């Protein structure tokens, strides 16, 4: 059986190809182009899982326009057209406050995941993981978010929330997915990047805990696919026997992983 996994990340509300600064110019990146590509993949392949890895609603002039005009329903409508199987929370998804984020989550058709975001008031409809069944194959999708959000975000935007280590959270949930849920394939979708070189382990940035990708990848935890983001890098390859991807930002690329 062939299973195709698609990932977008850090779209930052770049919906249209039309330039925000020049009305006569069209960009090479946009959700409209992403949708065309995803639709093509789905036409050509029977078993496709598509995950958006977060930072969806903030970052472009259009995102600001939607916020200022309280027009979130139309932005969510665009994302629903892509029909993701799961959406992960990114750090910038908290920038406009929890009421705005809650509305976005409620408008989405897809489940929203972040296992290490702890909501003591249960205000946001978020889950740690979901399970997809494709014929006789059971696929677990675990969502994780960078734990560093309190260092950036306004306190009023994350009131009642706490953010745990992605690594420590994965240590808890991955055995559940493999041993209790009996998943054949486990995908970890982490809105975070790598603070160490993915091959050599050399430190690239300060080891603050913002980006736990390297630690997750080499943790000896049992998972098969590692989708990353946050750092706006392009990563594609097999590392430590795990398929790893990161698709850049602003809807410029789509990561594609094929499992047989």
Stretch-by-stretch model annotation:
Residues 1-260:
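Acidic, metal/ion-coordinating pockets
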